């Protein structure tokens, strides 16, 4: 832990140094602008370059670092470069940044570098190698980088003096031209990057030490045949080719999951051990990787440094920005080899592939239930612990999942970001829009295996299946009546309480169910949006249309177990069964008379209350029953009631 703390501490110093340098950069830019306006002859301040703010490591240091320390190094380097680009510094992307973005190792062992690159040049004895290492080895302490400007090597072929650039923070002297190469050399370390074609020309500097001059300049000689990506080291190309080949030599002994990089395996193994060494000092949440902690901190600070150039939406993580940009481009580069389905994110493809393999490597320690995703295990564990870490600051309600919390917040804000392209109706949840779209497409993907009836929603199928099993788990404590759904029980209990929370804004009539209010309002509007494709008849309720369509198909899926009579509606079967049982569950509290149907009780109650809700629009006469109004209207139209 001491070594790790040292690296983290030193890296923090480096980030603080970057902060100071960025302040200096902004100040320098302002001063330069003022100098131009005032035509001051003062020498302008020098531009901050990537090398001024970078964090450098030797190859030896890189090999000795733990995976968490390497991840920290990657985060710091990438953020430093991003900040430079953000403030407008026109910098060419360094090779090390290119590698880090591809999640490749930025360095290899010095022995490999000497052995792989320019073997004709670097076959020198041990004494010369030590002298060369003295020239190119960097300062080992990250926090003690120094700027070396001492000129110690002279190339006699081109009559140029090269500085010993022993740190990534180099001299401000940009490039050094070599006439024989017709190329520019940034610093002496570039000599190590030449491939074949080098000419071994032994020169001597002012200290009498050997110095070799190269006659060719190839920085990235290794190219991937699959995607064309360039690499300066063959070892890096070999590692990269594993991505295309699908090679994953590092396998987890716990769950069998394989990785192309050893450090990724080490990080993964912490999932099984539960090790989370990096803890947030704000909320106490712990993480497996330091980079995850750094990203998490942005939740508390609100920092979102990555902005979309198309819509200017900002993100706390660069990966989220990259994924977001695919919304604008429509790019889905990750394709499933089994079914051809494409995804905009690689992680989604990986999770999708588990559907085909059936892989569920993550098991709950409490109940043994297995999951394909680690995040699913985390959420599942909260069902055992009762943990609800996401609390609404509006109403105090807490949630176990962040996604559910976000959806809940929309009930306060009224936000409905998911809009139907067919009718313009908006929804707060993506799943609600998906289900709604089936109204337009008539898609019913969920089919009952018992009777073949199909549904657009899975929950409707589950509810329907209880009809076949006879399961009614929700029982009324007042009358003992049982229901398939909890929502049906809640609505039923309003019969006992007399509660009618849904009132019509036109006539003031109240209802115990919202659906009844919606149906009632269509009386005022005359709206009948549901049309039969067979005969064109229109209905104000979708359910009525569905029942009507059974007339054309002759479908009668609900059969009486007593007499075998079949019905098109389950409600009709329920009423019919009462003719066998003699059940009359609806009793008048005025006179004690009982009825087998709720509608008959309602009509009967009007004899006590005198209510006559059905009024003739011709003469104003009112009736207690709709059927009576229909018969009465025939007197105005001259239509005669046919008796068969």
Curated annotation (Swiss-Prot):
ZnF (C2H2-type) residues: 222-244, 250-272, 278-300, 306-328, 334-356, 362-384, 390-412, 418-440, 446-468, 474-496, 502-524, 530-552, 558-580, 586-608, 614-636
Alphabetical list of Pfam families matching this protein: KRAB, zf-C2H2
Keyword Transcription regulation: yes
Highest rank taxon of the organism: Eukaryota
SMART domains reported for this sequence: KRAB (SM00349), ZnF_C2H2 (SM00355)
Main location: nucleus
One Gene Ontology biological process: in utero embryonic development
Family recorded in the similarity comment: Belongs to the krueppel C2H2-type zinc-finger protein family.
Subunit description: Interacts with TRIM28.
PANTHER family: GASTRULA ZINC FINGER PROTEIN XLCGF26.1-LIKE-RELATED, ZINC FINGER AND BTB DOMAIN-CONTAINING
Name of the protein in its database record: Zinc finger protein 568
Taxonomic lineage from the root: Eukaryota, Metazoa, Chordata, Craniata, Vertebrata
Gene from which the chain derives: ZNF568
């Amino acid at each position: 832990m001491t070594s790790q703390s040292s690296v983290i501490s030193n890296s923090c110093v480096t980030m603080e140094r970057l902060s100071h340098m960025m302040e200096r950069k902004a100040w320098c830019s302002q001063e330069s602008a003022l100098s131009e306006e005032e035509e001051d002859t003062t020498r302008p301040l020098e531009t901050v370059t990537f090398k001024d703010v970078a964090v450098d490591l030797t190859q030896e240091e890189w090999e000795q670092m733990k995976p968490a320390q390497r991840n920290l190094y990657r985060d710091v380097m990438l953020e430093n470069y991003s900040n430079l680009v953000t403030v407008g510094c026109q910098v060419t992307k360094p090779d090390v940044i290119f590698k880090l973005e591809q999640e490749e190792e930025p360095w290899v062992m010095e022995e490999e570098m000497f052995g792989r690159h320019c073997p004709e040049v670097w076959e020198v004895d041990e004494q010369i190698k030590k002298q060369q290492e003295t020239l190119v080895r960097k300062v080992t302490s990250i926090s003690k980088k120094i700027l070396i400007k001492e000129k110690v090597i002279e190339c006699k072929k081109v009559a140029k003096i090269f500085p010993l650039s022993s740190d990534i923070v180099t001299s401000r002297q940009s490039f050094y031209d070599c006439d024989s190469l017709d190329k520019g050399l940034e610093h002496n370390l570039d000599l190590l990057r030449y491939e074949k074609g080098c000419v071994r020309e032994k020169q001597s500097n002012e200290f009498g030490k050997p110095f070799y001059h190269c006659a060719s300049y190839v920085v990235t000689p290794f190219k991937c045949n699959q995607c064309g990506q360039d690499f300066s080291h063959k070892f890096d190309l070999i590692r990269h080719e594993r991505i295309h080949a699908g090679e994953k030599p590092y396998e987890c002994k716990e769950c069998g999951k394989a990785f192309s990089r050893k450090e990724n395996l080490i990080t993964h193994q912490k999932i099984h051990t539960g090790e989370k060494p990096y803890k947030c000092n704000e909320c106490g949440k712990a993480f497996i990787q330091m980079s995850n902690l750094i990203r998490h901190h942005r939740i508390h600070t609100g920092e979102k440094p990555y902005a979309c150039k198309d819509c200017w939406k900002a993100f706390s993580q660069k990966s989220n920005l990259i994924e977001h940009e695919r919304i604008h481009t429509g790019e889905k580069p990750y394709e499933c080899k089994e079914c051809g389905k494409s995804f905009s994110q690689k992680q989604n493809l990986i999770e999708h592939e588990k559907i085909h393999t059936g892989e569920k490597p993550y098991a709950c320690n409490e109940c043994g239930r297995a999951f394909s995703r680690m995040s699913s295990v985390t959420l599942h564990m909260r069902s055992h612990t009762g943990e609800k870490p996401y609390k609404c600051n509006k109403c105090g309600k807490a949630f176990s999942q962040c996604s559910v919390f976000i959806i809940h917040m929309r009930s306060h804000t009224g936000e409905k970001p998911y809009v139907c392209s067919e009718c313009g109706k908006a929804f707060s949840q993506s799943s609600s829009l998906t289900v709604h779209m089936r109204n337009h497409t008539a898609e019913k993907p969920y089919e009952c295996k018992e009777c073949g009836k199909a549904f657009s929603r899975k929950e409707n199928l589950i509810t329907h299946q209880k009809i076949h099993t006879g399961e009614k788990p929700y029982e009324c404590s007042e009358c003992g009546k049982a229901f398939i759904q909890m929502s049906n029980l809640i609505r039923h209990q309003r019969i006992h309480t007399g509660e009618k929370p849904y009132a019509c804004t036109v006539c003031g009539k109240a209802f115990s169910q919202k659906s009844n209010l919606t149906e009632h309002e269509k009386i005022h509007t005359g709206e009948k949006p549901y049309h039969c494709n067979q005969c064109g008849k229109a209905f104000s309720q979708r359910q009525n249309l569905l029942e009507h369509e059974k007339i054309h198909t002759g479908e009668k899926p609900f059969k009486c177990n007593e007499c075998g009579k079949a019905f098109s509606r389950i409600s009709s079967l329920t009423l019919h069964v009462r003719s066998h049982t003699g059940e009359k569950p609806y009793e008048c509290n005025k006179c004690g008379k009982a009825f087998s149907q709720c509608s008959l009780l309602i009509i009967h109650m009007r004899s006590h209350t005198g209510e006559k809700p059905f009024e003739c629009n011709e003469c104003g006469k009112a009736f207690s029953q709709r059927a009576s109004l229909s018969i009465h209207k025939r007197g105005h139209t001259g239509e005669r009631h046919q008796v068969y």
